[in-house]
Amino acid sequence: MAEGSWSVARVAKLTAAGVQKNERHNERKNESYANMNVDLERSPLNVHFKDTGGLTYNEYFQKLIDEGKISTRGLRENATLFNEMIVDVNTKYFEERGGYEYARTFYEEAYRFACGIYGEENIISAVMHADEINKAVTEELGKPVYHYHLHIVAIPTVRKEIRWSKRCKDEALRGTVKEVINQVSHSKKWESKVPELDENGQVVRNEKGKTVFRKSYSVLQDKLFEHLTALSLIHISEPTRPRLIS
C-alpha cells in the first residue's frame, strides 16, 4: 500500500437484540443518518455480495435453526449469536486506484475470504457501503469522495460431536458419536491456536511455562492481508507491511 495507507478487519460480538441496530444501519433501514455522513441518494450503489432474501437478521438465524443447520444448544439467553466483521481501508487508497470499481473488486474478495472463515451459508449479509462521504478528503481534493467499506454479519459456528452418554442402555453405543452439529459459539470460533513467537522465532511461554497464543483477531488480519496481497489487491511500496489495526 502507499505510504500512510492502512487496512483493518475487526469483529464485533452481537446478541439477538443488539444485532437489530446494526441491521438498520447496514441495510439502510433508517430514514435519516444525520451523524453518519450518509448520502441516501447514493445508497442504490451499495453492493450486496450476500443478502437475507428479505428476512431480518434474526429471521435468517431462526431459519437455519429450523432447518437443523445450526444449533444453540446450551447457550444462555443473552449469548453472542452474531459476529459483525468490518473490513476497511483508508479512503485515499481506493480513490487513487479507480474508486468505486476497485473497491467493489477488493471487497468481493474480502467477502470470499470471510466465506472461508464462516462458511457462506452462515453469512447473513455482506454489503459494501458506497454512500458515506468523507468530508475531509472531499474538501482536500475539491470533489465528492466516498469512503468504501464492507459490513459482514455472520454466525460463528464450530463443528461439535455429540456422544452417547454412559447411561445409554446399549453399551456398544456408549462414548460413540451420536450426531454432529454446527454449534453457535463465538468463543470457540475465535479460540486462538497460533503460538506467539519472540524475535528469535521461539514460542513464547507465560510464567507457568504454558504456551502464549496470538490474539485471534491479529491472526485474522494477517490472513486477510495475505489473501488480498496474493490477488494483487494490496500493493506494497514501502519496505514494511501496511499497518493492520484492530
Each predicted region: which residue ranges?
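N-terminal nicking endonuclease/strand-transfer module with a His-rich metal-binding environment
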Residues: 1-237, 241
